[in-house]
């Protein structure tokens, strides 16, 4: 099959180079967007009288038929067409004859593909936002059920202070909310139309860029035709926002992987979300969070690919940009599957070992700060109280005991302000309850935050 650009050439393309040059193998993903873009363009050409009303309508009907043929499996874009744009145009010409050759008037593949990818990505951003909302609902459900479940909090992977498990999961709700906000910001820059910029300089054909932008649901148009066809910032911004989403998924995955180990035993996996070993019959493997953690690197790699792709390309459009689609397609597929998998894992794949969690917070020194705070409440300066508690910790370690094992007279050897109520202050439930500053892990604050999230998520 001859190429539309072949008249300028004296010999045909080397078969391998033809295959190397083609993008139809992956840009056929954009078939619906390409058809919608062409329908809007044909309507505009009719509106501006570049095409007659009959020609415009004939093209539109032909494009609609191609869409239906594809849905029914009667049209399958592929080689020898170079890309999805030519594949559809060739099919259109087959259907309606020479009138189909007028469709490309006033545009280039450069602005056409830029429009297609924006239409596709806009839709996928909305889908990912919905998946994030569903994940937030699952996180909320776990939090709401575990207000009074305590878990050791860590800094530097060392026991720090006890927390409400609900508070822990609310932290992830905040992270994913920021992710949703970033996606909305990216969407705003995705939703600008390059259509009508043509190859790079605009066109002398009478077109109406604002009309096609409105038809396709764009908020605005690019004001500079060179920028319109050469901009791939929006791809990088999306990949960056996606990398952050994956980093948050990877963090919670890592925690779940730790929690379900025998060493932690804070939780266990249900049979619905675990696999076994081909050799070791006792194993129950956390494949879901491990895969999410692993796929994070894949999304990071896609971001790096896109950054590298544009770092040295001069204005305006370059064939390098053909390489922007697969990283974006892969990122969308990967992040969508990981969000779904994490939601299922939270909904039906993990059960918390409450007895182990209670035992953990009752048998460590994570209430040391509260011991210092107790002395502060007795007008002991914090730095002095800190030093006193450090001495008590050291004493307990030499005796292989905990604070709760000390009798009152032992406490009072370190400071005479220790009274009988010290034991109540060291109780883990009271420790958590007392952290009632705004945004803290205190039960009252956690309930306030849960109510705030309920309004955000369900109203």
From Swiss-Prot:
Gene Ontology biological-process entries:
arginine biosynthetic process via ornithine; L-arginine biosynthetic process
Its keywords, alphabetically, are:
Amino-acid biosynthesis, Arginine biosynthesis, Cytoplasm, Lyase
Q: Pathway, per UniProt? A: Amino-acid biosynthesis; L-arginine biosynthesis; L-arginine from L-ornithine and carbamoyl phosphate: step 3/3
Q: Which Gene3D superfamilies match?
A: Fumarase/aspartase (C-terminal domain), Fumarase/aspartase (Central domain), Fumarase/aspartase (N-terminal domain)
Q: Which GO terms describe its cellular component?
A: cytosol
Give the EC number(s) listed in the UniProt record: 4.3.2.1
User: Of which family is this protein a member?
Assistant: Belongs to the lyase 1 family. Argininosuccinate lyase subfamily.
Protein known as: Argininosuccinate lyase
């Amino acid at each position: 099959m001859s190429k539309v650009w072949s008249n300028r050439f004296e010999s045909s393309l080397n078969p391998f180079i033809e295959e190397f040059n083609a993008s139809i193998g992956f840009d056929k993903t954009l078939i619906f967007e390409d058809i919608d873009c062409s329908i809007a363009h044909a309507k505009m050409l009719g509106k501006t009288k570049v095409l007659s009303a009959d020609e415009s309508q004939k093209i539109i009907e032909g494009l609609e038929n191609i869409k239906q043929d594809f849905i029914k499996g009667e049209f399958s874009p592929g080689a020898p067409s170079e890309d999805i744009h030519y594949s559809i145009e060739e099919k259109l010409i087959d259907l309606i004859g020479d009138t189909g050759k007028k469709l490309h008037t006033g545009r280039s593949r450069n602005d056409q593909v830029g429009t297609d990818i924006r239409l596709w990505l806009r839709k996928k951003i909305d889908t990912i936002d919905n998946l994030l909302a569903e994940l937030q609902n699952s996180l909320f459900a776990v939090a709401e059920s575990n207000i009074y479940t305590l878990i050791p909090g860590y800094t530097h992977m060392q026991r720090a202070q006890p927390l409400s498990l609900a508070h822990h999961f609310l932290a992830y709700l905040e992270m994913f909310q920021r992710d949703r906000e970033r996606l909305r910001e990216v969407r705003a820059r995705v939703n600008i139309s390059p259509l009508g910029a043509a190859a790079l300089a605009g066109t002398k054909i009478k077109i109406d860029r604002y009309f096609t932008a409105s038809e396709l649901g764009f908020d605005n148009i690019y004001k500079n035709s060179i920028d319109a066809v050469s901009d791939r910032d929006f791809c990088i911004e999306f990949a960056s926002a996606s990398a952050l989403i994956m980093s948050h998924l990877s963090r919670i995955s890592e925690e779940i992987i730790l929690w379900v180990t025998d060493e932690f035993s804070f939780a266990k996996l249900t049979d619905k979300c675990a696999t076994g070993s081909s050799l070791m019959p006792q194993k129950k493997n956390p494949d879901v969070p491990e895969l999410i953690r692993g796929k994070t690197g894949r999304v990071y790699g896609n971001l790096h690919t896109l950054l590298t792709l544009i770092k040295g390309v001069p204005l305006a459009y370059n064939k390098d940009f053909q390489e922007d689609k697969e990283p974006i397609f892969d990122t969308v597929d990967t992040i969508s599957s990981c969000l779904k998998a994490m939601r299922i894992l939270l909904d039906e794949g993990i059960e918390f070992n409450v007895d182990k969690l209670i035992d953990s917070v009752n048998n460590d020194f994570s209430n040391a700060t509260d011991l210092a705070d107790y002395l502060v409440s007795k007008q002991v300066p914090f730095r002095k109280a800190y030093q006193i508690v450090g001495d008590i910790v050291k004493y307990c370690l030499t005796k292989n005991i905990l604070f709760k094992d000390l009798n009152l007279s032992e406490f009072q050897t370190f400071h005479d302000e220790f009274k009988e109520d010290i034991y109540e202050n060291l109780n883990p439930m009271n420790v958590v309850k007392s952290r009632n500053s705004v945004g803290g892990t205190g039960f009252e604050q956690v309930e306030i935050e849960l109510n705030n999230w309920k309004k955000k998520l369900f109203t």
